[in-house]
A protein has these predicted regions:
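Non-transmembrane, amphipathic alpha-helical segments
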Residues: 88-91, 95-98, 110-117, 121, ...
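C-terminal motif of bacterial Sec signal peptides marking the signal peptidase cleavage site
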Residues: 17-23
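N-terminal intrinsically disordered, low-complexity, charge-rich
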Residues: 24-30
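Amphipathic alpha-helices that form helix-helix packing interfaces
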Residues: 103-106, 110, 125, 129-132, ...
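Extended amphipathic alpha-helical interaction segments
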Residues: 156-242
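A cross-kingdom marker for long, charged
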Residues: 231, 235-306
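N-terminal Sec/ER secretory leader and immediately downstream segment
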Residues: 31-149
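Bacterial N-terminal signal peptides that target proteins for export
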Residues: 1-8
Length: 306
């Protein structure tokens, strides 16, 4: 589920740099999460321009916060619908910008709902997703009638989420193939913000250390989001969103992530034995740092859903 990422970004006139993963564990355990690391020389106030091809690769490599759903349940905190975006809010979202952002929000909510097997409210969230997808002309990727039938039985929830995820993947691929990566980037951002918002609420209630680390390690993802969104700063709504991400980047500034080489791992691939260099990563932050990050995330989320 959590995989190490190593990919090359070509920026400006063919400049190359590597973005590698950094996990999160103050105890020095092997990385369990994805974090995309930028060299300090490329993290500046000036926006970097990415080609459409590279934008597609970056967006595709940012892990959806839906993948954090297992940590939500492991925290021991009971399911709370009040922290999710109310499906009735769909009528508020009248622009493509709002619809794309909140399509991401509801996708993260669905992951949280599925984790706790709350099939009694799944349909209303699927309907919200369908309405927003129709609003940005990608509703053809969601067979709502089939999804609704599957949602009527708790025994079908795994298949339901698999089908939903397949629909989202097809939709994302279509958007990027149609040179609508600006829309795809909004969906990714909305999903990421909602996942961090849910995680923040759970941390406030439980103090869960693993989730706290997961929030803190997202510093590198924020750097990537800033680059992605800055490419569309001239589009309606994006300038304000970029400013919000810059505020979040400032909140993450005190967080440090250090990485050391661990023992190589042996795996078999295509009949051959290969070695993969493991990494041991540690995230360093104070309770005050975490509180400031969570407060900033909550502020951004409020702007998106209201």
């Amino acid at each position: 589920m959590y995989k190490n990422l190593l990919f090359t970004l070509l920026i400006m006139a063919g400049m190359q740099f590597l973005s590698s993963c950094a996990g999160c564990s103050d105890s020095g355990k092997k990385s369990q999460g994805d974090a995309l690391t930028l060299p300090d020389s490329l993290i500046s106030d000036a926006p970097l321009r990415l080609s459409e091809e590279i934008m597609n690769e970056v967006i595709g490599n940012i892990s959806s916060p839906v993948e954090m759903a297992g940590l939500f349940k492991n925290s021991g905190v009971d399911f709370t619908q009040r922290i999710l975006n109310n499906p009735d809010n769909v009528s508020r979202y009248e622009t493509s910008y709002q619809r794309a952002l909140n399509l991401g929000v509801y996708s993260a909510d669905l992951g949280y709902i599925n984790t706790f097997d709350k099939n009694n409210i799944v349909v209303s969230y699927l309907l919200a997703v369908k309405n927003l997808a129709d609003g940005i002309r990608v509703g053809q990727f969601f067979d709502f009638n089939a999804l609704r039938r599957m949602a009527s039985s708790s025994t079908n929830l795994d298949s339901l989420m698999e089908m939903s995820q397949t629909s989202f993947n097809k939709m994302d691929s279509y958007l990027r193939e149609q040179n609508r990566s600006n829309v795809s980037s909004l969906i990714v951002t909305g999903a990421w913000v909602e996942g961090m918002y849910i995680a923040s609420n759970i941390v406030r209630e439980s103090g869960d250390k693993e989730l706290s680390d997961r929030i803190a390690e997202q510093k590198n993802v924020v750097n990537i989001l800033e680059i992605i969104l800055s490419n569309y700063a001239s589009d309606a709504g994006f300038a304000e969103l970029v400013q919000s991400v810059e505020d979040l980047k400032a909140a993450y500034a005190p967080v440090r992530i250090t990485t050391e080489l661990g023992e190589p791992q042996r795996i078999e691939k295509d009949g051959s034995l290969i070695f993969i260099q493991a990494e041991v990563s540690t995230v360093h932050y104070s309770p005050e740092d975490l509180e400031n990050i969570m407060a900033t995330i909550e502020n951004i989320r409020a702007k998106i859903v209201n």
